[in-house]
């Protein structure tokens, strides 16, 4: 059995880690390199850096952060946010990222997934999906630009398309659950897992250790992403893992 992973996510804006609720109201959490080292020591299996800077200066600061972090990190580092081209991916991998996460750029140009997968290998390419449930149309749709713009692309169609194009992993954020700490969107995640064979990282809603136990007990996703509850020290990576083990689920 493949062991489940717990992955802290750091949203980085202009060189600082920030966190909001449902993609709004950002507050400063701290220095990304220091936080990355803390999670490295605390038993995290991987780290995700999401660059939400709006400026060129912010994006350049991100490269420095990645380089400083990667030189001291012993776990895989995935970097996403603002990636538009193969050149951007090359730059991130050269600065120490192990994987890249594509979102808006992949929706705009799906061939970028195939080109990136062919050039760097499927294992490097994670597709991030901000999934919004539209109650009027009774379907989940993909959002772009950090969850701000709704597209007409249905999530269940998109996940199958990206797998065929060469994505190695999916990072699915249920926007209605993000930062709410009420539990993961189990039904939605289970449905996505039934449509693809690649690993899924679940994001949005993890409010306590038990939510991660439920996630892994009720779906076959590979990993759970956590931000607020870890940054605010409401729980720790080890406490989450201990609860998962006690639930009879194999975890790294």
UniProtKB/Swiss-Prot annotation:
Pathway: Amino-acid biosynthesis; L-histidine biosynthesis; L-histidine from 5-phospho-alpha-D-ribose 1-diphosphate: step 5/9. GO terms for biological process: L-histidine biosynthetic process. The keyword Electron transport does not apply. Its EC number is 4.3.2.10. It catalyses: 5-[(5-phospho-1-deoxy-D-ribulos-1-ylimino)methylamino]-1-(5-phospho-beta-D-ribosyl)imidazole-4-carboxamide + L-glutamine = D-erythro-1-(imidazol-4-yl)glycerol 3-phosphate + 5-amino-1-(5-phospho-beta-D-ribosyl)imidazole-4-carboxamide + L-glutamate + H(+). Heterodimer of HisH and HisF. Belongs to the HisA/HisF family. This is Imidazole glycerol phosphate synthase subunit HisF.
